Amino acid sequence: MEILYFGVLIFAALAGGKLAEKMGLSNVVGQLLAGIIVGPAMLNWVPSLHIIHVIGEYGVLLLMLNAGLETDVKQLKQNMKAATYAAVLGVVLPLVTFPILALMFGIQLQTAIFWGIVFAATSVSITIAVLNEQGKLASTAGSVILGAAVLDDVMALLLVAGYAMFIGGSGLGPDSVMPLVAFGLGLLVRRWSGSSHFLELSNSIGKWTLFPIFFGSIGLMVSFDNFWNEAVLLVILTIVAVATKYYGAGWGAQLAGIGKTDSRAIGAGMISRGEMALVIAQIGLSTKIINHMEFSSFVIVIILSTIIAPIILRPLLEQVTD
């Protein structure tokens, strides 16, 4: 029976991803929504089984390994100053704002800090697609976004590791540090001449099995219990998630000497949360730092930010310099 559940989840996630792409959305959004639809929150075709989440964890590790394999350290040298400023301010602003917001809602300090870490992470997979679509990937804005995204991912992982030290190891165990290890391993393997073939193979394996299981399993954990009671919080979280990245990364780029128009595009390009934020949120749930209600809210906000980002970015890219 478990094999059947896996089959349904993978099929639904892959189909959802394809449908999302046709609608101009991120593949990840489609897979997440598919998990929500077939999971306990809606159709209840696939229960939230422990084995599904265990296999999904391997998807996380492969995802982070591939992130390391795809990270071009040389890319950081191009527009390094602007990328650094955009990444740092784009991380600092949500890292400060979300804990304050959480404390206002009565969340304990330890958990409030984790809120900031979750929303400090950025995913630019959808941004890269939009940049490619409009031929702006090699533009100044495109280059800064790519460089900032690399730094952003590294900082997000370091924040998780630092948080583990902050709480004295009581919440995050060795399993929680494994994504960081996988990312580092990817960076090392990238130096090998055959790394491109290895990346192609691991991407193929992940694309058809582990990735849809991971993203689909995230959807299985979403609950709409007390959804309407949390509607105001969801709206606030989404607005803050969009604003902190847009203004944080945008201001950072401007401080580095990038023009206002390009800086706005850079800010918009950093709005989307995705894989990294989901990985961090998953760590928080599995280690009981956040509860299921918070986790569900985070997933919904991550989905909304991924949908909103290209809507803001597309018109701004038409104005940027090449």
Task: Give, region by region, the residue ranges found by the protein language model.
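Small-residue-rich segments of transmembrane alpha-helices in multi-pass membrane proteins
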Residues: 31-41, 64, 85-99, 147-161, ...
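Transmembrane helix-loop junctions at the membrane interface of multipass transporters and ion channels
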Residues: 159-173, 220-232, 281-292
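Membrane-interface junctions of multi-pass transporters
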Residues: 19-27, 37-82, 176-237, 258
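Alpha-helical transmembrane bundle and helix-membrane interface signal
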Residues: 73-78, 128-173
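Transmembrane alpha-helices that form the ion-translocation and gating core
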Residues: 81-136, 229-320
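Structural signature of hydrophobic alpha-helical transmembrane segments
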Residues: 1-9, 48-65, 109-125, 174-185, ...
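Hydrophobic transmembrane alpha-helices of multi-pass small-molecule transporters
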Residues: 1-28, 170-178
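Transmembrane alpha-helical segments of multi-pass membrane transport proteins and ion-pumping complexes
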Residues: 9-18, 35-36, 40, 58-62, ...
